[in-house]
Amino acid sequence: MGTTKVTPSLVFAVTVATIGSFQFGYNTGVINAPETILKDFLNYTLEERLEDLPSEGLLTALWSLCVAIFSVGGMIGSFSVGLFVNRFGRRNSMLLVNLLAIIAGCLMGFAKIAESVEMLILGRLLIGIFCGLCTGFVPMYIGEVSPTALRGAFGTLNQLGIVVGILVAQIFGLDFILGSEELWPGLLGLTIIPAILQSAALPFCPESPRFLLINKKEEDQATEILQRLWGTSDVVQEIQEMKDESVRMSQEKQVTVLELFRSPNYVQPLLISIVLQLSQQLSGINAVFYYSTGIFKDAGVQEPIYATIGAGVVNTIFTVVSLFLVERAGRRTLHMIGLGGMAVCSVFMTISLLLKDDYEAMSFVCIVAILIYVAFFEIGPGPIPWFIVAELFSQGPRPAAIAVAGCCNWTSNFLVGMLFPSAAAYLGAYVFIIFAAFLIFFLIFTFFKVPETKGRTFEDIARAFEGQAHSGKGPAGVELNSMQPVKETPGNA
């Protein structure tokens, strides 16, 4: 195999794909900053329509729906990933669904002029479906165009896109930028611009070579794309690996979601994929970000919105750090470090919130604990669950597996968002102890069950799980991790 390198074609393709990740992050964070203004819009619109003041219960229900419908859309979208990628391909799927983002942006952007609550809610639903699809398309495409030795680093760019999107939404949501009563429609409708940019750039990106060879049997085109992306003429080893996988796929029928759960070959990697997605959401990160302004306010911070943006900056910086570490330390190690660090920080957050009224310094401890907590999240649990799912499965079951894992991620995201306020009201500062318990459980699970995928081909990983399924062994971390990755040579460095 020739020496692979980071080519302009590869960087361009991955960067354009991560615009979808940016959209997910932006639309996750954009609803939080103008909360008061949007509630006023709901109140005014309903008052005009009902010719009476709406009840507090109706307003609360509608606001909750505006927030939660995004996650419901995400569940629908993530579960529909396979329907698109198997029929249209990875690149063309990303191109097609941008139409959803444009329609959603128009609905949200013109909701105020039309005085329509329904347009706002429908727009949030459609942008949720779009983002759910993106959380499947982007990691899959990046994983399939990246060289084995760089797959983890490029996979982390998916998470970088998400956190940059959240940060941009937080900054643009400031009242003196777009978070004002006059400009909030522009804040929500801004999602149209990345959709148009990505639609314009995607035709210049190649289709996934794995999709072309394995699904479409277009070997010559796949070879040409691989050579251009990786900057080497010698891609014989990768092409042969894809051809072997293509032969295996031709001997099997299309893998459906139901068959994923039935086949002993897929049960263990699917379990790992689901638990890793849960480890991301049940770590408490979204609870911290959804309610960070309130947490900082409770901790005594004078300008909590700026502290929240500070957390977003830390989020972004440590995602970049993870990008450089993931191919050195490995996925499994970084994930465990992240989970362990977050568990410790959760305990410190609890202690500082309990003692802040008695000791002024505890407000500072709380802020530092949150910032370090966010840093540990981006070291492991943030980026790794997204791209490791694509690594654990071969071409056939990959779309269905990503759909199931993505749906679990969105569902747990939705449940945390719905249940955290009640849990926080009932348990107070002790609520973060629940997250600490989850984090410890996920740390133990990762140690015993999650394999190291660094430097290993998709085929190698799939065969390891198949061998264990046939021998009746579970995927204990020691067993699978005792297998050596592809030996580092100039060809895969």
Swiss-Prot record:
Facilitative glucose transporter. Can also mediate the uptake of various other monosaccharides across the cell membrane. Mediates the uptake of glucose, 2-deoxyglucose, galactose, mannose, xylose and fucose, and probably also dehydroascorbate. Does not mediate fructose transport. Required for mesendoderm differentiation. The chain crosses the membrane at residues 11-32, 65-85, 91-111, 119-142, 154-174, 184-204, 270-290, 305-325, 332-352, 364-389, 400-420, 430-450. Residues 469-493 are annotated as: Disordered. InterPro entries: Glc_transpt_3, GLUT, MFS_dom, MFS_sugar_transport-like, MFS_trans_sf, Sugar/inositol_transpt, Sugar_transporter_CS. It comes from the Eukaryota. CDD domains: MFS_GLUT_Class1. The modification Phosphoserine is found at residues 471, 482. Disulfide bonds: none annotated. Residues 33-64, 112-118, 175-183, 291-304, 353-363, 421-429 are extracellular. Residues 277-279 are annotated as: Important for selectivity against fructose. Pfam families: Sugar_tr. One of its GO terms (biological process) is galactose transmembrane transport. Residues 1-10, 86-90, 143-153, 205-269, 326-331, 390-399, 451-493 are cytoplasmic. This is Solute carrier family 2, facilitated glucose transporter member 3. D-glucose binds at residues 159, 280-281, 286, 315, 378, 386. Its main location: membrane. Expressed in spermatozoa (at protein level). Detected in brain (at protein level). Abundantly expressed in the hippocampus, cerebellum and cerebral cortex with lower expression in the dentate gyrus and piriform cortex. The modification Phosphothreonine is found at residues 232, 489. It is a multi-pass membrane protein. Interacts with SMIM43; the interaction may promote SLC2A3-mediated glucose transport to meet the energy needs of mesendoderm differentiation. Transport is mediated via a series of conformation changes, switching between a conformation where the substrate-binding cavity is accessible from the outside, and a another conformation where it is accessible from the cytoplasm. GO terms for molecular function: D-glucose binding; D-glucose transmembrane transporter activity; dehydroascorbic acid transmembrane transporter activity; galactose transmembrane transporter activity. GO terms for cellular component: acrosomal membrane; cell projection; cytoplasm; membrane; perikaryon; plasma membrane. The lineage of its organism: Eukaryota, Metazoa, Chordata, Craniata, Vertebrata. Keywords: Cell membrane, Cell projection, Glycoprotein, Membrane, Phosphoprotein, Sugar transport, Transmembrane, Transmembrane helix, Transport.
